[in-house]
């Protein structure tokens, strides 16, 4: 039943160098969290300054899927925000000018499903990744995958 997936890997991220050929810098979750929450005022101000420099083209920034997943987890578990608020904040991050985000389309679908289906973000990302790559079957014991149209959860025997 297992099928080979020749193109299941994501293509390399398009990391565009700045005009002076410098490489982009990775932005960690805490920078986004300070920016989004405003707590630790000095750090929040510094985070905003960094993101504004990127918006003006003075900095080239990148972030990863795992960073976005960490942001979702912290906003949910530490800040106890509702899913709608978390979705709005993640969409704002994904739309920041000057920031390249790994698998941005997949993340956008995942955060929509996170709010709509009340499924944990990691499962939403996996379902969105599957859809993006044309996969339909997932081996899992997790019943949450039953909520995704077009996916067939398989229970190993």
Give the label of every model feature segment.
Residues 65-66, 89-116:
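Acidic catalytic patch
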Residues 141:
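Conserved residues at the C-terminal ends of beta-strands
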Residues 57-61, 98, 134-136:
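Short active-site oxyanion
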Residues 57-58, 96, 117, 148:
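Structured helix-beta-strand junction loops
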Residues 1-63, 78-85, 91, 156-157:
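Short, well-structured N-terminal submotif of metal-dependent ribonuclease cores
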Residues 120-137:
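Acidic, metal-associated active-site segment
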Residues 144-151:
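Short loop/helix-cap segments at secondary-structure boundaries that form the rim of catalytic
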């Amino acid at each position: 039943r297992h099928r080979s997936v020749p193109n299941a890997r994501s293509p390399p991220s398009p990391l565009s160098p700045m005009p002076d050929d410098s490489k982009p810098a990775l932005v960690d979750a805490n920078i986004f969290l300070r920016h989004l929450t405003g707590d630790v005022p000095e750090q929040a101000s510094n985070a905003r300054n960094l993101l504004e420099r990127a918006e003006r083209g003075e900095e080239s920034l990148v972030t990863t899927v795992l960073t976005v997943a960490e942001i979702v987890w912290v906003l949910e578990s530490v800040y106890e925000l509702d899913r709608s608020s978390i979705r709005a904040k993640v969409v704002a991050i994904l739309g920041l000018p000057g920031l390249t985000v790994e698998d941005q389309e997949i993340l956008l679908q995942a955060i929509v499903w996170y709010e709509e289906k009340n499924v944990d973000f990691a499962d939403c990302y996996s379902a969105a990744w599957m859809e993006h790559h044309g996969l339909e079957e997932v081996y899992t014991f997790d019943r949450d995958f039953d909520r995704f149209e077009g996916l067939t959860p398989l229970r190993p025997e």
